[in-house]
Regions:
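ATP-dependent carboxylate activation and anion-phosphoryl transfer catalytic cores
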Residues: 1-209, 217-222
Length: 223
């Protein structure tokens, strides 16, 4: 901080508190009275990794019913309190069984095409209707949280570090992925397998009889 301030910068310095935990993301449609929530996505990567660089799983794979109820309740209150008519993106953090709001964006996010495809809810079309005066309850999808389908869907980021050789591959708050793919399966493992294969990470190469290895990177305080 001393190094930053000694240069006499004029812009404010923002210091965030970091909490380890599980990040979640919600895209909702609000008309100012009712809210439609197609689904809740859970990130696999640690908290602090940019949402665009995280693997997002729908539906969440280890969130309790009580916590899901809190997420839905908070999402509805936030969307209605903002007074937004259209799309709202909300990012949460669960840490020590407490729910924290990371940020709320009254706009579309990169997860809208993903959640629209895997839930069958055309979010952009519906949000456009809401913005032009149609009520959420008249869209034909009900209100609140939509029922989860009998399958898992994962959004897997695609990186280009082999081409951007000078880029630091360590994932953090700055987005580094250059694309993303979708994997759908009857189980979470099947969806992850398909997603990772499509992203070029090739888990299929780990066939029986082949010599393989796993690289583990562990923080000093976790050793």
């Amino acid at each position: 901080m001393r190094r930053i301030l000694q240069n006499g910068i004029e812009n404010p310095v923002l210091v965030d508190k970091y909490m380890m935990g599980s990040e979640l993301e919600v895209d909702v449609i609000s008309d100012g009275r009712d809210v439609l929530i197609p689904g809740v996505m859970q990130h696999i990567e640690r908290a602090g990794v940019h949402s665009g660089d995280s693997i997002a799983v729908y539906p969440p794979y280890n969130i309790s019913d009580i916590m899901m109820h809190r997420i839905i309740e908070c999402s509805e209150k936030l969307a209605l309190s903002l007074g937004t008519k259209g799309l709202v993106n909300i990012q949460y953090l669960i840490w020590q069984n407490e729910l924290y709001v990371i940020e709320v964006n009254p706009r579309a996010s990169r997860t809208v095409p993903y959640i629209s495809k895997v839930t069958g809810v055309p979010m952009v079309d519906l949000a456009t209707q809401v913005m032009t005066g149609t009520a959420v309850r008249d869209l034909g999808f009900g209100t609140g949280l939509c029922k989860a389908p009998p399958y898992f869907a994962v959004k897997v980021p695609v990186f280009s570090f082999e081409k951007l050789t000078d880029a630091n591959s360590y994932l953090g708050p700055e987005m580094k992925s250059t694309g993303e793919v979708l994997g759908i399966g009857r189980t979470l493992n099947e969806a992850l397998f398909k997603g990772l294969t499509a992203a070029g990470l090739s888990p299929a190469a780990l066939a029986p009889g082949k010599e393989t290895g796993v690289f583990l990177s562990v923080e000093e305080h976790d050793r």
